[in-house]
Amino acid sequence: MAKGKELKGRIRSTENTRKITRTMEMVATSKLKRATDRVAAARPYALALGEVLSHVYSPELADRFPLLRRPAAPRTVALVILTANRGLCGAFNANLIKEARSRIAELEAKGLTVELHVVGRKGVGFFRYVNRAIASQRTDITDKPSAADAASLIDGLMQRFAAGSIDAVYITYAKYLSALSAPPATEQVLPVAPPTAKAEGGVQHDFILAPSADAILEALLPLYVRNAVYRALVETEAGFQSAQRTAMKNATDNATELLQVLKRTYNSARQAQITQEIAEIVGGASALQG
């Protein structure tokens, strides 16, 4: 009955694992709802900022604002890479790192020096493992990213860009499209590229600019950049929760299938053992009668 005991042990272990993965799936589902609510709340604000900026901006103003500066001969760029602090999310982190490495290779092929600013333990751990220099790292951003997190992440880079010590800032993140799709993407954050469309859906709005276009643009540009980073943070978090929910659901389903196989195998082994014991008893009784 050694095989039967071994199977019972595997059944208990698999049942315990299924309880854990099912619980993690439920937690991820709950967190995903909150994360998608933050994504939905961030998008209208981003559209409104973009609409106002498109009305205020004009090419003749560009030379007066450092965040609009486009260096003629860029030398150094910063790449902000968003990853998760945790795993158990399928290929989510691996895909983000793959996207980042692809962009790094692309930028370096143009002769640019690329500074890495990595968010998340998984990204930090990977680039340390491959001995890639990291200019800054953050592992303290929680699963509820805030506007303050975005400001603390980008404000220093904005100051350096305005001072001319870096010539562009890019961000690699998970672009949340739906619960089933959050592909990795890289976007340029600095210099700011003002939206060209005057308004969404072809609707035009007239603005009265006060005190002046310059004053509005000076206040608006940092908000626009911070909001772009905040949106990347909340979309990446939503993508992570979606990936973890999917991974844990798959693990739960696999555990259920394995349990069915193990129980069938155990029942077959138990049945064979009982049949053998009956045969031995019958054989022994027949021998005594004989």
From Swiss-Prot:
A single cellular component GO annotation: plasma membrane
Chief location of this protein within or outside the cell: membrane
Keyword Transmembrane helix (UniProt): no
Localization, UniProt: Cell inner membrane
Membrane topology value: Peripheral membrane protein
Single GO MF annotation: ATP binding
Keywords, sorted A to Z: ATP synthesis, Cell inner membrane, Cell membrane, CF(1), Hydrogen ion transport, Ion transport, Membrane, Transport
SUPFAM superfamilies: ATP synthase (F1-ATPase), gamma subunit
One Gene Ontology biological process: proton motive force-driven plasma membrane ATP synthesis
Alphabetical list of PROSITE patterns matching this protein: ATPASE_GAMMA
Coiled coil: none
General function of this protein: Produces ATP from ADP in the presence of a proton gradient across the membrane. The gamma chain is believed to be important in regulating ATPase activity and the flow of protons through the CF(0) complex.
PANTHER family xrefs: ATP SYNTHASE GAMMA CHAIN, ATP SYNTHASE SUBUNIT GAMMA, MITOCHONDRIAL
Similarity field: Belongs to the ATPase gamma chain family.
Subunit structure: F-type ATPases have 2 components, CF(1) - the catalytic core - and CF(0) - the membrane proton channel. CF(1) has five subunits: alpha(3), beta(3), gamma(1), delta(1), epsilon(1). CF(0) has three main subunits: a, b and c.
Protein name listed in UniProt: ATP synthase gamma chain
UniProt organism field: Gemmatimonas aurantiaca (strain DSM 14586 / JCM 11422 / NBRC 100505 / T-27)
